[in-house]
């Protein structure tokens, strides 16, 4: 009886605090995080993926 009554308020407060704290930084970081990941992904994913694909699967993925 106390569980259902304590779960809604607790869950609501926890989600609201997490959502509220995660929304402002996420929104502000969105434009700032998009450029870095793209550069990091392009520079670190292309060579890494190419080397891993070439050494791990040369016949299946020659030069995709």
From Swiss-Prot:
Top-level taxon of the source organism: Eukaryota
Bias (Low complexity) ranges: 8-32
Region (Disordered) residue spans: 1-64
Name of protein: Putative uncharacterized protein DDB_G0293418
Organism: Dictyostelium discoideum (Social amoeba)
